[in-house]
Amino acid sequence: MLSTNKNRLIEMLSAALTGLAQERGLEAPPTPRLERPKAVDHGDVACNIALQLSKAWKLNPRELAQALVERLQQQTGFNELIASCEIAGPGFSNFRLSNAAKTAVVQEILSGGTSFGESAPADGSATSAMIEFVSANPTGPLHVGHGRQAALGDALANLLATQGIKVHREFYYNDAGVQIANLALSVQARLQGLKPGDAKWPEQAYNGEYIAEIATTFKASPEFKDDIEAIRQFAVAYLRNEQDIDLKTFGVKFDCYYLESSLYTDGSVAQIVGDLQSIGKTYESEGVLWLKTIDDGDDKDRVMRKSDGSFTYFVPDVAYHTSKWNRGFQKVINVQGSDHHGTIARVRSGLQGVAQKRGWDIPKTYPDYVLHKMVTVMRHGEEVKISKRAGSYVTVRDLVEWSGGVTPEMTSEERELALQRGRDAVRFFLISRKADTEFVFDIDLALQQNDENPVFYVQYAHARISSILQQWGGQTSDLASADLSLLQSKASDHLLRCLAEYPEMLTTAAEELAPHALAFYLRNLAGDFHTFYNADRVLVDDQNLKLARLALLSATRQVLQNGLKVLGVSAPAKM
């Protein structure tokens, strides 16, 4: 239901309720809420305010609902908005919109174009936000878990942008610590001619072929020298570049790449530790420094500084999030794997200590988290667990190439088209389920070009409409004067209803940090279109009816295009 129609009906309901309350000396009513009936034959919108008020007002809910409807029918504009209303069950008011109210969405979409569905931030809500996602260690290629983060984070950023929020995308490079040291040792071992399985191969080394690629490239470079620090710097730079290439192929861009190492070099970590010590948030025991996280809801206190003097990994995380707040980002969302769940309490606890020391008003729930579960890749009915290049996992690059059907024999143009197909499939698939559910990625399904493939199903709806409009040969501007009252079939009614839900669906998905809701919606919209296409011929001889149906299809194509853009998926005109 369009927000304009919804707000008008709520205003009418509020006025009718207020009139009843004043007439009968009853307490002031709350603002009524509207919902979509579960069954289509129950109408377009329902309200249960009579049930809510019946006890407080000591009235029979059906009688109250009837009195409410009678008052509504006396209001100016009610009959233009509502075609009929019936009292159902114990006191539900089910409304059916007038044809004019239902079809108004078509012209609103055509006039709104690419901005249809977008809105401004609600009063008092954040107007800017940071989303941190992917944030992979520069120790290897991006794996499918990073791919899920990239798809979720980018779609979430686009989703928030539709609500007028200025979004900052950030990638946190974990370029300090033991894993980076292991990377350097792995490359050094390859330079020495060792390989996985050899007796002298380091126990914690990375085994993928990419380590050999780094070693070969470094040995041929002018910077080459047998020095562990030089090897470390080259390997990190090499893998950062590789990850950037993968992200570019995936269609994801960041505004900032923040280095963990900078938190040590600029003294941020030391300052955070000092702040927490100065307010009594820490204590020393058994030769280590502890943070009092139990006070903030954690199940036990956590080690900050180990006996060897090194810090545990959540300490720079606290420093990093202090930087986020200090840079003015009061709305921060972290998209991370569910294995990070245990760090949430300790990071928030550390931030509360910093806030206390510095006089900041950081909310206890800062930052927000979207945690995703693992991705399992299936191909030819079997789970794919390793990649030749990565050694122990499937990479994002593998997933995109497999899903697009990329082969070595392809021309550069064919390869680019295949990569686009793969990127679209991977992004749509990885967004199409709630983040907190495990996902099985079926390569064979991604390659199918039929209704079983969800991204093909949605994109084909867009392409089919484009083909119909091309056959017609007119201009979209010609549809502005279409007589939309002619749209009276059951199939068109379902399609109109789905189109009208788009703006509110976007708002709800943004509020709930749930981009999967948009993927669900687009599948439903494509389904309603395909049903309409099979039921109602569009290019009919009746010119007025043809223009009305073409206007409906043009509006549908626009919403499909807008929604796919938010997900980072293309909307092809041909397939």
Curated annotation (Swiss-Prot):
One of its GO terms (cellular component) is cytoplasm. GO terms for biological process: arginyl-tRNA aminoacylation. It is an enzyme of class 6 (ligase). SMART domains: Arg_tRNA_synt_N, DALR_1. It is found in: Cytoplasm. Disulfide bonds: none annotated. It catalyses: tRNA(Arg) + L-arginine + ATP = L-arginyl-tRNA(Arg) + AMP + diphosphate. Its main location: cytoplasm. Keywords: Aminoacyl-tRNA synthetase, ATP-binding, Cytoplasm, Ligase, Nucleotide-binding, Protein biosynthesis. Its EC number is 6.1.1.19. InterPro entries: aa-tRNA-synth_I_CS (IPR001412), Arg-tRNA-ligase (IPR001278), Arg-tRNA-synth_N (IPR005148), Arg-tRNA-synth_N_sf (IPR036695), ArgRS_core (IPR035684), DALR_anticod-bd (IPR008909), Rossmann-like_a/b/a_fold (IPR014729), tRNAsynth_Ia_anticodon-bd (IPR009080). Monomer. HAMAP family: Arg_tRNA_synth (MF_00123). This is Arginine--tRNA ligase.
